[in-house]
Amino acid sequence: MGKTVAIANQKGGVGKTTTAVNLAASLGVLEKKVLLVDADPQANSTSALGFDPDEVKLGTYQVLEHECTASEVVVKTNNPNLDLIPAQIDLVAVEIELVDKDRREQMLRLALEEVKNDYDYIFIDCAPSLGLITLNALTAADSVIIPIQCEYFALEGLGKLLNTIKSVQNIHNPNLDIEGLLLTMFDSRLRLSNQVVEEVKTHFSKMVFNTIIQRNVRLSEAPSYGESIIMYDASSNGAQNYLNLAREFLEKNEELEHSA
């Protein structure tokens, strides 16, 4: 049964979508079968993989509303072994529409049960908020990756997110783990970047991925061409960073499987 990983941080601009798309694509290149669920009404993962959100007829909205099964809305991407459940602007209405429903936090988990055996890993790209859609993602997930940019105020809001994760563990999903904190947008020339790395590693030590995602022009360009970095420029630093992250992620998860 595939492992489900949410990628979450209520701060915007920290590299959530970049990580969701490129970690998923890198695992696909490493011959893992991967599904990416776009659970952000901005639909950035959807457009970053070459789909126009305005033309998406079926996606995460219909899955959360249980109007369609997950398998009915899955689309193939041009990346090896990577499928997508796309998002469209309608997703913004889900927060209001689910509010009065029973088990409203469980909708995504229940929907993904159907496809969990079809994939090695399922990633959920969360919105930059702690609303009902993100709550659904955390309830559906086995673990969560938290991207943190190497910039001023990097740790701002992290305490709030960790408290939300704790309350999800207490109420909805006792098995939710923190997969790791991922440092993004690192620039070795900047003293501040190096200070943030030091501070995060001091505070969170073993929770932090060894792989650090560097600032990279090619990585920033790739989404505007509707491509993952691995398809856009496999030799770039950005592609190599995410391949290294994928290998680190696999090493950790395969060790856990062997010890289980």
Language-model regions, residue ranges each:
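P-loop NTP-binding core
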Residues: M1-A260
